[in-house]
Amino acid sequence: MGLFDKLFGSKENKSVEVEIYARISGEIVNIEDVPDVVFSEKIVGDGVAVRPIGNKIVAPVDGVIGKIFETNHAFSMESKEGVELFVHFGIDTVELKGEGFTRIAQEGQSVKRGDTVIEFDLALLESKAKSVLTPIVISNMDEISCIVKKSGEVVAGESVVLALKK
């Protein structure tokens, strides 16, 4: 670290504020209320869930799609600021083997906030899934210094659900 870094701070020491937008329209639900311990006990990270309305899951940030599960019920992505996100539709939806889900985006694709990643049939999923609560979690929480969770009704791609400092 040089003299100017000590006086003015280096880029590496500056925190970055990141807003994570709703990936699905609906009502925010506490992550602790998701009926799956993997999410409610924050085993895979901290975040929020949404009780969905509508028929699409969108990119919650500008970034790159990582892995999209073969069954299209979940995906990971990384924001341009390096925040790693995991989006999962419903609980035990993997057991539906892709029924009710249509992949729109592809792994490795650069996306903008609001771009459609997956489309879904909500009526079918409500009738067949254990729950349609849709969690989004930060999987690299060790790099996050502060997380503020929003509440209320949200619109996909338009409403902030999490405000972070990285």
From Swiss-Prot:
Entry's Gene Ontology molecular function annotations: kinase activity; metal ion binding
Keyword presence, Acetylation: no
Gene3D superfamilies (alphabetical): Glucose Permease (Domain IIA) (2.70.70.10)
Residues noted as binding Zn(2+) in the record, renumbered to the chain: 73, 88
Residues recorded as bearing Phosphohistidine in the entry: 88
Cofactor: Zn(2+)
Keyword Zinc annotated: yes
GO BP of this protein: phosphoenolpyruvate-dependent sugar phosphotransferase system
Co-factor binding comment: Binds 1 zinc ion per glycerol kinase EIIA-Glc dimer. The zinc ion is important for dimerization.
Keywords: Cytoplasm, Kinase, Metal-binding, Phosphoprotein, Phosphotransferase system, Sugar transport, Transferase, Transport, Zinc
Main function: The phosphoenolpyruvate-dependent sugar phosphotransferase system (sugar PTS), a major carbohydrate active transport system, catalyzes the phosphorylation of incoming sugar substrates concomitantly with their translocation across the cell membrane. The enzyme II complex composed of PtsG and Crr is involved in glucose transport.
PANTHER family the UniProt entry points to: PTS SYSTEM GLUCOSE-SPECIFIC EIIA COMPONENT
Domain free text: The EIIA domain is phosphorylated by phospho-HPr on a histidyl residue. Then, it transfers the phosphoryl group to the EIIB domain.
Subunit structure: Heterodimer with glycerol kinase (glpk).
Protein name: PTS system glucose-specific EIIA component
Highest classification ranks of the organism: Bacteria, Pseudomonadati, Pseudomonadota, Gammaproteobacteria, Pasteurellales
Gene assigned in the entry: crr
